[in-house]
């Protein structure tokens, strides 16, 4: 009797082990990972904007398919998965998703066998490090070695193929909108906006619109050479007669045909004194007018409605170096904007969305960089 006891114990252990593995567990990670902890720099990612949504009552029940059992993930905070990704590329409107929505390949969505519907997850392309947020709104895949099926838009953003391995990290959205879960480790989610700036005030606003170019015209005044003091030696040629009709070199930003304007350019020359002096003389401070013209031009060029954001990092120095390199490579202005613990790297601003889109295309084709357009603030 005592000799048979070990045999019975071993047999019982085998039965228990088989019961633990015959559960469709291959669809989830074998060992539930611990809640993710950030030990590196924080990065800002884009994609579907997570928002609180009640779970679909019909799409979150345990089920069986093709002889396999699938258990819906009850605690996404302890779930993570890595494996090959498929591309779900059906025609728009051809079928409904498990959430009851019409499938749209241009939305950043995905299908997963066991994650809650609807829910959100951070998807990382393990080959190139790209990350986006997708919305889980469908079930699948079945009968393959793929762990998730991405929409065409999501696959293009991640630059995945049928042989690309990805990592799935859920993002949990609380009723108050706060985000947590493995997908938020070392990550902040960018809130994209394509809102246009407020409409200009047209009730008498025409005067304000014309005031910008009118200012430099009012500042450009004739100057008496007797009071002008300047160290600039790049003015008009010495051969200039100084007569109002004589050709002279125009200062930057000065309109041709404004005859009193060339007077400051002849200041370094002693010959043209009498003719400009006969014009309406003004005090010496007006000599600063030619300087204000070139300064106002870059200020106007730097204003715009749209910027192209290429990334965000937690190190300000790295962000500035990256922005300067991109600005030099693509010959566009740029800036680094702080947003909490991260520094956003933005190129622009641009006056129109078409200009920003053109830069987006160049970033994609020439540098293989993902970006998105946001309104300049």
UniProtKB/Swiss-Prot annotation:
Keywords recorded for this protein, A-Z: Cell membrane, Cell wall biogenesis/degradation, Lipoprotein, Lyase, Membrane, Palmitate, Signal
Top-level taxonomic group: Bacteria
Disordered, as annotated region: 196-277
Biological process (GO), any one: cell wall organization
KW Lipoprotein (keyword) present: yes
Gene3D superfamilies: RlpA-like domain, Sporulation related repeat
Magnesium listed as a keyword: no
Start-end of Low complexity biased regions: 208-218, 264-277
An annotated GO cellular component: plasma membrane
One Pfam family here: SPOR
Localization (cell): Cell membrane
Membrane topology, record value: Lipid-anchor
Protein name in the entry: Endolytic peptidoglycan transglycosylase RlpA
Species assigned in the record: Salmonella typhi
